[in-house]
Structure formats: structure tokens, C-alpha cells
Amino acid sequence: MKVHHSIVAAACFLVATVAGVTAPRITTVSIAGEGFLINGKPTYAGRAWKGQSVEGLLFNSRMVQGIFDDLNTNTVSKWAYPDTGQWDAERNTREFIAAMPEWRRHGMLAFTINLQGGSPQGYSREQPWHNSAIAPDGSLRPDYMQRLQRIMDRADELGMVVILGYFYFGQDERLRDEAAVIRATDLATQWIFDRGYRNVLVEINNECNVRYDHAILKPERVHELIERVRKVSRDGRRLLVSTSYGGGTIPKENVVRASDFLLLHGNGVSDPKKIAQMVRQTRSVAGYRPVPILFNEDDHFDFDKPENNFVAAVSERASWGYFDFRMKDEGFGEGYQSVPVNWGISSDRKRGFFRLLREITDVRP
């Protein structure tokens, strides 16, 4: 079936190229109650693991650097590949795309990517590098968006969902004012519709409660952008949208009421019991109604232990997402956020995640 989908996608792309129109898309994500569906069918349909249903969950990984580049000539040399001594944005995207089928074969149905990336060091106090698909006036940079389109086209072919973040707190200062933020939101939303993507979940910004410059990206007002995206429709279809908070933070009522699904982060939460508690607390926020709860960032591992954050999320019927970066003195094979990235399943931590993911989902590579 995967081969068939690839052939169909390639044929449709050729027809669309000749005709000058957007290719028909293969993958559609939707929501029913607390579960996700792909092409009208619950994810991991009928699957249970250790007595716990995983049907409708959306296991994922934080892969935010898929279109990374650095426009700051003073810092770009930091990201040189060890084999060439140079940074190469095209190579980064090309290797990302090449790795995607293997992620999918292990049962991973979604990944997060961001128009402004994330810290290329994993965590950073200062972020002088300039990595943004969004120009100061809110327009979209064509080179970044062309790289993103290649990734999203491949995700569509593979039956994968893209959690697309618009803004990141380490780069939002690159936009000159609130009008630029609103323009970027509108243009990114239009870009998705113009290309016919139906496999997208929008994350307005990564961790809205962390040092953003623009007030509309902060917790008190971010729901305005969520609602703005939700109001846009084309051919009777609109995008599914939410935003996230820093590790351990429970979404606020304004975001809970406005969102189609709820994003949690497990960074800083080392006790799996507290991960389960976060899910229960989220369901208790005023305005909550049955929608999916999804962790899309958690830098805790212990995948070989009976209790870990991944397992704890599953126990509360919440989706979970892996966040890994290259730690001090580690080699090129480690992490999916530190630049340059080895996008393969190239380390013990990565293998541990994908091994447990494959066990939980019963997907065979």
C-alpha cells in the first residue's frame, strides 16, 4: 500500500505540474472526540498495549530543524558538518526527507517542525543566530518555504501528520511588530491552503509562556491567533490549531476554549506520575471538552524501564512526543534538535524510543 501511495503521489504531482495546479493530497488528519483520525480511520485502530488502548493517539517526535538555516554570518560556522566543515541547509532538508520513511516504519505518525526552528543547541540562554522562515515584515522567505514544501509533500505521501509551528520564542524578535506577527500568521495559513495540505496541525507558537517579545504571542492573548486561524476556511475546510506551554505547565482556560487539541510539554517533569497528573489536570481546566491531548516535547527517556514519561502519557490516553538533543561531549549521531542533525536512528536513545514506539504500536519496520 505504501508503494501504491507513492506511485499515485508521483503521478498526481506530474499531472499537477503540467496543469499548473496543486496536486491532490493523500493524507487528511481529523479529530473525533479525544482521538485523531488519518483518512477517516482512527490511528492505530484496534491496537491495545498492556491493556491500554492506543487507538486515536498520535505518537510523534520534535524535529523542528528540518528547514534550519542561519542568516547570521557571525554564527553560521557553528553548524558545520563534521565531514565537510561547512553548514549546508539543503543537505539538512535532503537528509531529513531521506530519514522519514524509517520513522514511519517504526510507527511514528507525526513530527513537529517550526518556521523559526528551536534552539540548535537544545537549550540556549541567548540565541544570536538568525533562523526564521519569516521576514521582519511578516512575509515568508521562499527558500525556507520551498524546503518545507518538500518535507510536507513527503509526509503526505507517507501518511504522516505535520505539527507545524509558526513562531519560536528564540526568534520572534526578528518580526518588527504585532502587525508583522499577524501578517505571518495569515500568510502561513494561506500557504497551507494554497498547497492543499490536509495533514497539518498548527501550533501557533512553541511555549507561549516563555520570553516572547510580542504580546499577542504571550499566554493572555495567544488565543486571538488561534481563533484567527480557526476562522479561515476554504471549500468548507479549516485547519486544526492549538499552541503549547513550557514544560510542566497546564494550558490556561482561554487556550483550552479556543483550541482543537491541547499541547503539553514534559520538559522538567522527571517523575512519570506527574506526567499522568498533567493530563488529568488539563482535563479539569474550565472550558475543557473532549479533545485530544498531545505531548509534543519531552526530553525524558528511560525507554527500557517499565515506568517512563512515554508510558505515563499512554496510561492517561494522551499522545507523546520525543525531544532529544546532543548533550555535552556527545557525537554527531546524538539528538534530533542540535545542529547539524543526524536525522537517522543513529544513537542508543533514538533506538530506545523507536523500539518502544514499535512495541506499543505493533508496527513492524
What residue ranges belong to the model's regions?
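Extracellular glycoside hydrolase catalytic/binding regions
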Residues: 183-184, 199-201, 205-352
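Short, flexible coil/linker elements and helix-boundary hinge sites characteristic
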Residues: 1, 156, 196, 344, ...
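Extended substrate-binding grooves/exosites of carbohydrate-active enzymes
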Residues: 27, 34-38, 42-90, 284, ...
